[in-house]
Amino acid sequence: MLPKLRLIVAVIVLVSACSSGGGGELPAGPDLMKRAAEAMRAVKSATFSIATEGKPQVPLKQADGRLTAAGDADGTITLDVFGILQEVSFAVIGETVHFKGATGGFQKMTRAQLAQFYDPSVILEPTRGIAQLLASATGPEVEGVEGSSYRVATTFPGQVTGQIIPGVNQGVNAKIWLDQATARLAKASLPLPGGTVTVSFSDYDAPVTITPPPAG
C-alpha cells in the first residue's frame, strides 16, 4: 500500500503544479507593466473586440474591428442611445469617418464629430490609448500564468480608462493578460458598476489597409 500511496501523492503534486501555470519565477508587476506599455506603443496594427457582460453603465456595449497606429480603423460599434441599442458600421480614414446604421447607406462625418460618441482609433494612440493605460496602472501584481500569458491584477485610473471606454470616470480594479513573449496586451477584464467590460486583442502587426466603403 505504501508504494501506491506514494505514487498517488506524486501524481497529485504533479497535477497541481501543472494546473497552477507555474514554472519559473514570475516577473515583478511594475517591470512587466513598463514592458507592456513600451510594447503597445510600438504596435503598428491590431484586431480588437470590446464586449460587455451584465449591464455596465457605459454607452459602448460592443465593438469589433481593425486598427492602425496611424489612426485609421474600421468595424462595427453597438451603442446604447437613450436606452435603444444601435449598431453602426464605420471606417475612419484620416479625418473622415464613413458610417451607417441598420438602414440606409453610408454617410460622412469628421473625426472630431465621431469623438463626441466614441473614436475607436484612440485605442492605439500612444498618449491616450492602451499604452497610456498600462503606463498609468498602479499596484500591478502578477498573479500567475494562463496559457501563454501572465495574469496581472492592477488598478487603472478612471480618466485614462474613460478614453477607451466612454462613461468610465472612476478607478477600475482590473485583470489583464499580457503575452509572455512580447508583453503585448491579450485581454483586459474591467469590472464596472452593473457588469464587466472585456477588451481583447489579436493579429498584432498584421497588414491592414482601411479603404472607404462603396458609394451608393
Where are these regions (language model features)?
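Sec-dependent bacterial lipoprotein signal peptides
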Residues: 1-16
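Subset-of-secretome marker
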Residues: 18-216
